[in-house]
Structure formats: structure tokens, C-alpha cells
UniProtKB/Swiss-Prot annotation:
Its EC number is 6.1.1.11. Homodimer. The tRNA molecule binds across the dimer. Catalyzes the attachment of serine to tRNA(Ser). Is also able to aminoacylate tRNA(Sec) with serine, to form the misacylated tRNA L-seryl-tRNA(Sec), which will be further converted into selenocysteinyl-tRNA(Sec). L-serine binds at residues 233-235, 287, 387. ATP binds at residues 264-266, 351-354. This is Serine--tRNA ligase. It comes from Clostridium botulinum (strain Loch Maree / Type A3). PROSITE patterns: AA_TRNA_LIGASE_II.
Length: 426
């Protein structure tokens, strides 16, 4: 959520920034918010005048009673003033509700570092690691490799559940589990994150706090009778861990890593990446989440991105880092990097992690603040997160980049201790 004061003082700048985003956004709502805000402030002035008058009248009652005078007219006046104030309070509550409704639907403002552009074709590559994998045979797609090795079963998952689900079997399940452990061990032991195992269901307030609701409700799996949602990412429960709390300044930055299953309807992705592990309704992911002071957040974003890159380097998977343009930025981020791994079957790079700085956008929605000391005024933290990284897509990248002509797959060396010392899946 944006700062209403920022909108009030920089409305034209805010409109221009919102116009430059890719998603179509009606900037006239900014004028609507400002009109409601002005109406609200005018009513508050009137309420203060009425309260002052009521207090003044109220202070006269004891004196008049002591003098034996009739106070019925004054009591009646106090009652009328109270009723008038009550009416204004009702109006204010309705105005606040309207303002909140609009504010929750206004996207974040891009940081000045975000490049111009409308689609993912306008994203800018800022670095890459290793050359795309070359083969002296015709490489197969990961869904064929997995099926041939009997470690992935898409057909039976379709029978049991439906499309975009997978059974991992044998060494496929072992590979998935090994990646989860390797990612968690790396981020806790090498990078200093505290491990969290979160709930896989959250309430509506939590989804609003991180920005999934109200805009993306159609993309979420909902348990209607309880108004719970299956989490689309561990970002949601881990960020809301500190909702409505004031943190200590000397505790920041807080760094958490969480493994979870993730659930997405992929409502807007019909026809895209329908085969394999790239776009599933249920998948596993290790998520990195940070809470920082505002002046630290962009330095911490670079560190978080490097932390995610580390596991890809150690796995030996070719990848690149792209800076996302304004049109592809999404609803909540102020600046975002995507890590994309090379996928031979696609003959292109495929996203495996998004690393974002939300500045105070989520913190305002979730009311997460900090104080430098006991006497200091609370300030909103900046929140950051990034995949560290998506498990299923990593399995796909390993199967495709480490495949051999005989149909086997070499296991990356860093994973072999987790795979019982095995060197290949045959």
C-alpha cells in the first residue's frame, strides 16, 4: 500500500509512475482518493470544533449546579453535540472504508532504477553465468527424461488429481528431497538465514498483507467455509509472521528461509508451459524473506539475489540475471530481478527465481514497523523476498542440462552426499 501522504504531496508524479506500468491502471482513482481524503480531513476539523465546544459546555455544568441553576438546556446541547459528532464518525468510517478499498488496489511505484519497457522482451540482462549447455546428441525434454527413467509420472497424477500435477518416484523423489535439504542447509549455514517451517494455509488478512488479495483472488486456491487460502508462496506466512508488530531496530535485518509447498491456479496461463514441471498447480519452493531498515534495503536485495545465485552456481546450471522492466514488474515490487536457468528443450532461459524489494508497500498493508530505540517513533520496515530457489524447475533444469546420450542423468556433485553417494540416475 502506498503512503497516502505521498499521494497527497506528489499526485502528478504518482500518476505518471502508474501510467508507466504495464498493467492497465485507471489513474483517475488517485483523484478519487484525494477527494475522499480532503472530505475526511474537513470532517475531522469539524469534529474537533464540536468536541472542543462540547468540552467547554460540559465544564460549565458543575459550576452551574453548584450555584443551583438549571442545567437542562446545557445537557440538551451536550446531547445534540454528541449526536452530531456520532453522525460525523459514521460518515468518517464510510469514507475510510472507501479509501482503504481503493488504496489496496493501487500497485507499487517502480524504483527509478527500473528500466522502461512494456513486456518481458524489454527486461535487461545484467549478468550471466556459464554458457548454455551444448550436446553432441539430440537432447530430450525433462518430461520425457523423467518418464523414461520412471522418476516422474504425469499420466497417473492426471488420473489421481488432474492436469499440472506430478508424482515424483524413486530417485526423482529423492532428488526433490535432496534439493530442499541442500537449499535449506546452504541458506542457513552459509548465508545466515533462520529456518522457518510455515503453515500452508493462511487467512484473508495475511493474503491482503503481502498483496495477493484483493487483486489476485482468482489465482488462489480457497477453502471457502473457513475463508482460508492455500499459500501461493512461503512469502505470505513468513512476511505476516510480524504483522501488527513493532520490531527492534538492532534486530534488523531479519533473514528467514522457508521451505513450503506452493499452490497456484495459474488462471491466466492457459496454453503456456502445459507439459512438464515448469508450471504446476502444486510445487515445492525454498523462499528467502528479509525485513530491513529503509536505508539498507537495496544493499540487502543485492545480497539476497547473490544468495539465490550461489545455489545455481554450485549446481552448475547455466543462468542469467535480468532486471525487470516497468511493464513486467508486477503489482507489489518496487524493483525486481529474475534469475533464469537455461532449458535446452525450450532453447531459452526460464525463470527460476524472482528477487524483489517491496520497500514499505507490504509493511504498510501488514502494519510491520520498527523502532530504533524505546523513545523513537515507529517506522515501516522494508520487506524483500526471493526464491532460493523453486524446486521443481531446478529438477527440470538438472534433468535437461545433465542428461547423457544413453538416457541417464548425471547428479550434480554438490547433491551427491544428499543422494546417498550416487553419481547418476539410470
Amino acid at each position: 500500500m502506498l503512503d497516502l501522504k505521498r499521494i497527497r504531496n506528489n499526485s502528478n508524479e504518482i500518476k505518471e509512475a502508474l501510467n508507466n506500468r504495464g498493467e492497465k491502471f485507471d489513474v483517475t482513482v488517485i483523484d478519487e482518493v484525494l477527494k475522499l481524503d480532503e472530505e475526511r480531513r474537513n470532517i475531522l476539523v469539524k469534529v474537533e470544533v464540536l468536541k472542543s465546544k462540547r468540552n467547554q459546555v460540559s465544564s460549565e455544568v458543575p459550576k452551574l449546579k453548584k450555584e443551583g441553576k438549571d442545567v437542562s438546556n446545557i445537557v440538551a446541547e451536550m446531547k445534540n453535540l454528541s449526536e452530531e459528532i456520532k453522525g460525523f464518525d459514521t460518515t468518517l468510517a464510510k469514507i475510510d472504508e472507501k479509501i482503504q478499498y481503493i488504496m489496496l488496489r493501487i500497485p507499487n511505484i517502480p524504483n527509478p532504477q527500473v528500466p522502461d519497457g512494456e513486456t518481458d522482451e524489454d527486461n535487461i540482462e545484467i549478468r550471466n553465468w556459464s554458457e548454455p549447455t551444448k550436446f553432441d546428441f539430440e537432447p530430450k525434454a525433462h518430461w520425457d527424461i523423467g518418464s523414461n527413467l520412471n522418476i516422474l509420472d504425469f499420466e497417473r497424477a492426471g488420473k489421481v488429481t488432474g492436469s499440472r500435477f506430478t508424482f515424483y518416484k524413486g530417485l526423482g523423489a529423492r532428488l526433490e528431497r535432496s534439493l530442499i535439504s541442500y537449499f535449506l542447509d546452504t541458506h542457513t549455514e552459509k548465508h545466515g538465514y533462520t529456518e522457518i517451517l510455515p503453515p500452508y494455509m493462511v487467512n484473508r488478512t495475511s493474503m491482503i498483507g503481502t498483496g495477493q488479495l484483493p487483486k489476485f483472488e482468482e489465482d488462489a486456491f480457497k477453502i471457502s467455509e473457513d475463508d482460508y487460502f492455500l499459500i501461493p508462496t512461503a512469502e505470505v506466512p513468513v512476511t505476516n509472521l510480524y504483522r501488527d508488530e513493532i520490531l527492534k531496530g538492532d534486530e534488523l535485518p531479519l533473514k528467514h528461509v522457508a521451505y513450503s509447498a506452493c499452490f497456484r491456479s495459474e488462471a491466466g496461463s492457459a496454453g503456456r508451459d502445459t507439459r512438464g514441471l515448469v508450471r504446476q498447480h502444486q510445487f515445492n519452493k525454498v523462499e528467502l524473506v528479509k525485513f530491513t531498515k529503509p536505508e539498507q534495503s537495496y544493499e540487502e536485495l543485492e545480497k539476497l539475489t547473490n544468495d539465490a545465485e550461489t545455489v545455481l552456481k554450485e549446481l552448475g546450471i547455466p543462468y542469467r540475471v535480468v532486471r525487470i522492466c516497468k511493464g513486467d514488474l508486477g503489482f507489489t515490487a518496487a524493483l525486481k530481478y529474475d534469475l533464469e536457468v537455461w532449458m535446452p528443450s525450450y532453447n531459452r532461459y526460464v525463470e527460476i527465481s524472482s528477487c524483489s524489494n517491496f520497500e514499505d508497500f507490504q509493511a504498510r498493508r501488514a502494519n510491520i514497523r520498527y523502532k530504533e530505540d524505546a523513545k523513537a517513533k515507529p517506522q515501516y520496515v522494508h520487506t524483500l523476498n526471493g526464491s532460493g530457489v523453486a524446486i521443481g524447475r531446478t529438477v527440470a533444469a538438472i534433468l535437461e542440462n545433465y542428461q547423457n546420450e544413453d538416457g541417464s542423468v548425471t547428479i550434480p556433485e554438490v547433491l551427491r552426499p544428499y543422494m546417498g553417494g550416487k553419481e547418476a540416475i539410470k
